[in-house]
Amino acid sequence: MNPNQKIITIGSVSLTIATVCFLMQIAILVTTVTLHFKQHECDSPASNQVMPCEPIIIERNITEIVYLNNTTIEKEICPEVVEYRNWSKPQCQITGFAPFSKDNSIRLSAGGDIWVTREPYVSCDPGKCYQFALGQGTTLDNKHSNDTIHDRIPHRTLLMNELGVPFHLGTRQVCVAWSSSSCHDGKAWLHVCVTGDDKNATASFIYDGRLMDSIGSWSQNILRTQESECVCINGTCTVVMTDGSASGRADTRILFIEEGKIVHISPLSGSAQHVEECSCYPRYPDVRCICRDNWKGSNRPVIDINMEDYSIDSSYVCSGLVGDTPRNDDRSSNSNCRNPNNERGNPGVKGWAFDNGDDVWMGRTISKDLRSGYETFKVIGGWSTPNSKSQINRQVIVDSNNWSGYSGIFSVEGKRCINRCFYVELIRGRQQETRVWWTSNSIVVFCGTSGTYGTGSWPDGANINFMPI
């Protein structure tokens, strides 16, 4: 090959390489421009689309780095918009309840630093469930645990842990409270925390970790609330609060809260005579609560809360198999759906039930006199027919030889329906077990199932002789 041919060949190869490089640079430029404009296409509205005025919470904002031929391109992944919960799905159809969680707090207290608690409950955010309880400002193996049978002291605080995690020393103290309720509106937690003097207590409303509002006692007689979850629909949360006599006429009010601020207060109306410690659940578009009549009735009051116009109605569960303790035996107990049955109304215990068409699912202590044992069952016609007593699908949760306590409901939203779950407080120590000076609890939790299930008993399980005095 002569020199001229070599020059021509080298020139051709160089031109080819230059052309390829030029085309690659054009491709990189096009890719860069395309990705730059795509990152602004996340949920961008049409020019004539009206955007909502409420704030939008960005849950995550991730930047992805892509390396192309020494050129850096940043691509922003579309942020996820968090919305208020509306609970519009139907209620799950169930055959009974299956075990879900048990924290074994008392057994663990025999050899570890576990809080002394009572009044536990469970509530869930859209992704995870949490257990709450009112701590006594002390662990069990501590002299401060003496005489913790008392309900209202200034050292009590609301504790919060992931469900199944006992209240250890690292547990978060959410607020100061000897009575409480908590719920998640889809964006943040609301905590209602009552503390202070019996005759002049304060309820603090804490939303997203900030104190947003408060209200003082209106009857100067132990302002108190649900001891279980409140309910939020489309950004409005509702909670039932009572101030007044525990064994006579009291003043119950239903509060409506938006992002921690009280927006309305409705008085109790309807036929319920006394209302405390309600267990509430969403019944879209409204909220329904099953409560404790501590005055006249061993049948449980029902409160229906209209979330649109703030109107309130109340009545009583129709089932003649009544849910409170103490109560008459099942042969002689009664309920006419509208009024208290005037059967062993005082004192009572927190409990739950929920409607299922004309029927009702409910839980109660097995003993008619004491807080011992726990059972669940369905009463045919128990929601619509006065004094109905046809019971099916009975399950023993805690056998009659073991202590129980308060119980309450919480709701869990699935892909197709809303499931109902409940917890049972398993009280140990005083006043029933006088070998020790403390009073505390563990919990067991069950959820509705459409499947089959077996039998068993899930008591607290601690040997009182192994426990610190």
From Swiss-Prot:
Its EC number is 3.2.1.18. Inhibited by the neuraminidase inhibitors zanamivir (Relenza) and oseltamivir (Tamiflu). These drugs interfere with the release of progeny virus from infected cells and are effective against all influenza strains. Resistance to neuraminidase inhibitors is quite rare. Disulfide bonds join C92-C417, C124-C129, C183-C230, C232-C237, C278-C291, C280-C289, C318-C337, C421-C447. GO terms for biological process: carbohydrate metabolic process; viral budding from plasma membrane. One of its GO terms (molecular function) is exo-alpha-sialidase activity. The active site is at D151 (proton donor/acceptor), Y406 (nucleophile). It catalyses: Hydrolysis of alpha-(2->3)-, alpha-(2->6)-, alpha-(2->8)- glycosidic linkages of terminal sialic acid residues in oligosaccharides, glycoproteins, glycolipids, colominic acid and synthetic substrates. The keyword Ribosomal protein does not apply. InterPro entries: Glyco_hydro_34 (IPR001860), Sialidase_Influenza_A/B (IPR033654), Sialidase_sf (IPR036278). It is a single-pass type II membrane protein. One of its GO terms (cellular component) is virion membrane. The chain crosses the membrane at residues 10-30. Residues 36-88 are annotated as: Hypervariable stalk region. It is an enzyme of class 3 (hydrolase). Its cofactor is Ca(2+). It comes from the Viruses. Residues 1-9 are intravirion. Residues 333-347 have a biased composition (Low complexity). Substrate binds at R118, R152, E276, E277, R292, R371. Residues 11-33 are annotated as: Involved in apical transport and lipid raft association. N-glycosylated. It is found in: Virion membrane; Host apical cell membrane. Belongs to the glycosyl hydrolase 34 family. This is Neuraminidase. It comes from Influenza A virus (strain A/Korea/426/1968 H2N2).
